Amino acid sequence: MASEKEGFSLSETRLADFMQSTAQKEHVGLIIRKRGKNSSSGMYEGYEKKRGALLSLCEYILYEKDDFYKKVNISREYENILTLDEDSFLYNADELCAVLKHPMNSQYAVAALCGKPYLFSQNKNAFTAIFNAGGGIDTYSSYCVNFERDVLNCSNYTGKGCFRIREFNERVGNLFEDNTILSHDFIEGAFAKTVVTNYDVFEECPDSYSRFEARRLRWLRGDVQLLPYLFDSIRTKDGTPAKNTLTLTQKRHIFCNILSSFIALTLLVGLICAAFSGSVGFWSVLLFCLAHRVLAAILALPINLKALMYSIIYSFMDIVMLPYRALADTGAAMLSIIRLIRKKNLMIWQTFAHAKGSRVYIAVNIIFSVAMATTFAVLLKSVFLILALIFFCVVAMPGLSKQKQKKNGAKNQRFLKNT
């Protein structure tokens, strides 16, 4: 995107002209926001990125506040806004909106969707097959938890769902200090009150480990930047202090997300300490790293051998990438804390598309992982040779990331016919 001081670019003007001339414009709307200079980053960009775009749309619909550069076919006769990503697939949007209209959900401003990997995105390469079959390397696919909704009246909003325009704007429109929130979905859902639904939104899987890591590290930095919301007092948009109304459960979510930044480092230190203590301790910690995913697949009824195989594979991948993740996660968390203190560059993030094809994560991991394990093996104990051999497997990671589009198999074809 260009960063002209006029607040728009030539490409945006041409896009608006195309929208005005298309015959299908009654089905599609377009808004182009003006850009302003961000005092935190020094760059010309839209106010508060995606969060600001939603707030600007809400204010236009509610109060006819128009600070857009260009708008095409935008009505003010809306009650709800549906939020999806470019790679999202949703088949029951009307039913999702109906959830918010139910009298029992009158206290909620947001209805959240459950995120799941798109079935046919697993055909891209070996990495997507492993990622999709296991529901992902991280806990993203398990965010939809009914226990907290039923017992604690608390749900998570991950950015895909539907919200009531008026209630959402009243509850969070002027609540947050500018240029401080990178990942806004969870914290907005927490303050606006979210109900999780049984409806699924399907998304494309990352097609390489580097793209997956770029997205995961942005999420991690966004979680750490929510650290101020653990305290009893917060700062609002105009800088005045206000009481933090988050529940203990919601604060626990924030704390656990921040704490998860140091899991890889803790496991790596435990692995090294166990190797010093003897082979029994080493293998115990190694098996512990593998155990939770594999046990979950074994205890699932009925037992799915394919799922069990994939659980073993990406549990092994977790160990292979452990040194890199310890370095990357800790570095990202510390960087976010430093930026919080300095109050600078808190809104900088690398998008999913911009990270496409990057090999920097793989290169760093190869150098750091293999060098560390080999050095320990030479200077200290031969048991570290096992670590060195394991970490050498990271050389195969780029092979999992090659773009090899496969044809849909017979199973996928049957699925298409039956849906």
Question: Which ranges hold each PLM region?
Answer:
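Basic/Trp-rich segment in TM-proximal cytosolic loops or flexible interdomain/linker regions
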Residues: 129-157, 171-179, 204-377
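Internal catalytic domains of large membrane-associated glycosyltransferases
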Residues: 1-244, 408, 414-419
